[in-house]
Regions:
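Conserved class I S-adenosyl-L-methionine
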Residues: 1-46, 57-61, 81-84, 102
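Conserved Class I S-adenosyl-L-methionine
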Residues: 3-9, 21, 26-29, 55-57, ...
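A structural alpha-helix within SAM-dependent methyltransferase catalytic domains
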Residues: 37, 60-63, 132-136, 163
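Class I SAM-dependent methyltransferase SAM/SAH-binding core
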Residues: 47-106, 130
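Short glycine-dipeptide loop
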Residues: 68, 139-144
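A short acidic, Gly/Pro-enriched loop at the edge of an enzyme's catalytic core
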Residues: 104-116
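A short SAM/SAH-binding and catalytic strip from SAM-dependent methyltransferases
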Residues: 114-129, 151
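Conserved catalytic/acceptor-binding region of the Class I
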Residues: 129, 144-216
Length: 280
């Protein structure tokens, strides 16, 4: 499995791996939902699409916070994650649906959306210009989007700590900043240029900084086990043997322990929040 998972990876093994770690991922990333949903400006009933919805946690939170009469549709390329989202969605709630979709090839919806939102779902497209041009067609004229991406590696030590620990026991290739991956848009100007080229207007990017509870608030040893199991770089240990895995896990646990308070590891994070609109 690549350190830089592309869309095809998420449709297969990467999606399965993420589903297996939803118990820790969703509470860990939940703090990002607050600024993300606030930026949507849900001030009246509207149609909302959650792009790269994963297991549906953010989608369900949007429905809880949206005005009565709103509808929320979640889309993801991973069959495993859509299956999980459907399993947790209320069967008697017609205002929320989940569907399998590859945004780079999916047809433009007949009825466009008033809001588009994505929490860490727009960094993995194989052909970004095509994908963002498609997304522009998903948004109604005058509609608003909010996309979250990770800031720089230096400002997200919970992820760089994993790379450092793994690199102590095996050779880790240099990260390709142009490839699909979590830090693809660490330089926010890259995504702003793509969004501008896709025809979006009123573009802004603001940074959210806060502490994330690793694995949902696990102690250091358990957090290290979770992080290696959940991360794409942890997958590079496959085939290295149990001794290498144990060494990387112990090294990571020691790094995490420096950030443990009250029995839980919490580490700083920086997230870019991009907003804009479709002219009209």
């Amino acid at each position: 499995m690549s350190e830089n998972p592309a869309s095809s990876d998420w449709a297969a093994g990467r999606g399965e791996k993420w589903r297996a770690q939803l118990f820790g991922m969703e509470p860990m990333l939940a703090p990002v939902d607050e600024p993300l949903i606030d930026a949507l400006r849900l001030d009246q009933p509207c149609r909302i699409a959650d792009i790269g919805c994963g297991g549906g946690g953010t989608t369900l939170e949007i429905l809880r916070r949206a005005p009565v009469g709103s509808v929320v549709h979640g889309f993801d390329i991973s069959p495993a994650l859509i299956e999980s989202a459907l399993a947790r969605s209320p069967s008697d709630e017609p205002a929320i649906t989940f569907a399998l979709a590859d945004l780079e090839t999916a047809p433009t919806p007949q009825e466009p959306y008033d809001r588009l939102v994505s929490r860490f779902g727009v960094m993995f497209y194989d052909h970004p210009p095509t994908a963002f041009a498609k997304l522009a067609g998903w948004l109604a004229p005058g509609g608003r989007f909010v996309f979250a991406t990770w800031g720089s590696p230096a400002e997200n030590p919970w992820m760089t700590s994993i790379r450092e620990a793994v690199a102590e026991v095996i050779d880790v290739p240099p990260a390709d900043p142009e490839a699909p991956g979590p830090f693809r848009y660490a330089d926010g100007d890259k995504l702003l240029n793509l969004l501008r080229g896709a025809g979006f207007s009123d573009l802004e990017v603001l940074d959210w900084r806060g502490a994330l509870p690793v694995g949902g608030g696990l102690p250091a040893q358990e957090a290290a086990h979770f992080a290696l199991a959940a991360s794409s770089i942890g997958a590079l240990l496959a085939g290295a043997g149990d001794e290498a895995l144990d060494a990387a896990r112990q090294s990571l646990a020691e790094r995490f322990h420096r950030h443990q308070q009250g029995g839980a590891v919490r580490m700083g994070a920086c997230v870019h929040i991009f907003t804009g609109a479709r002219p009209g």
